[in-house]
Every structure is written in structure tokens, then in C-alpha cells.
Amino acid sequence: DILIRYKNVKKIYGYKIESYWNNISTVDAYYKTNMDFLKPEVRKYFFKDLPSVYSKVSDQPPAKYNPGAIVKNSLVGSGSIINGTIENSVIFKKVFVGNNCVIKNSIILNDVYLGDNTYIENCIVESRDTIRANTRHVGEDGIKIVIEKNERYAL
């Protein structure tokens, strides 16, 4: 629908893909698609087998992992600074993760600041947001929490 809506307004390009495809029209599908990139075979397909798939260039330094940072099965974007623990998550560009933060099974979009002692699980945090120190956001029983400007939306 969106491609048809903007076809005469914007330059739209696409790739013919034979194996992996996902519609991201719902929050659950968006979450699942991002989490699929934690699988080595999906990353290999898009970034090695199809080397002409590009990301937006933003001349950022590589992610910085400070002493005590722990990252397991996660993707961390350039320009990010990690001071806490990240597990099974996708962290976009220019994200600051404060001291003693824990992020699990979540997607953190661009330009997010997570204050010290923050706990995030099963969440999607919108771009350009600040999550205050000493806060906890958890989606439970398959419910994803979308955090936008410190407002929570359960989906």
C-alpha cells in the first residue's frame, strides 16, 4: 500500500528477493523481522550474498564497549556507547546505554539515551528518545511495549 501511495511522489527502489521476505505492517511483524537479523543465516543472506543491499551512511565511529559492558547475540549500530548488558537485541545507531542497564529481547532505534540502571525487556524504543534512569519497561506474555517519548503503549 505505501509503495503505491508514494510511487509518484518519491523515488522508490526495490530488490527482487527469492528467499527471505517479510511484511512489516504490524508491530509484531516489525519486531520479528528485526529479531530475524540476529540469525547468522539472515545476516549472511542480506549482507554477503546480496552485497548490493546498503544501509544509510552516517559517518559514525564504531560502537564503543566500555569496561564491564556485556553483549550477547545482539547487533549494535555505529556511534553507540555501551556501558551495560545487552542480550538478544537490535541496537540501532547512536544509542547510549548507561551504567548497569539491562536490555533483553528489544529493539532500540536511533539516537536513544538510556539512563543508568534502566531495565528494558520485550520493548521497541522509538528514535530520539530518552529513557530516564532507574526505570523499568517490560512487555510480558507476548505483549510488546512500544516506548515513545517516555509514554508506554502495550501492543
Language-model features: locations:
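Left-handed beta-helix
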Residues: 1-155
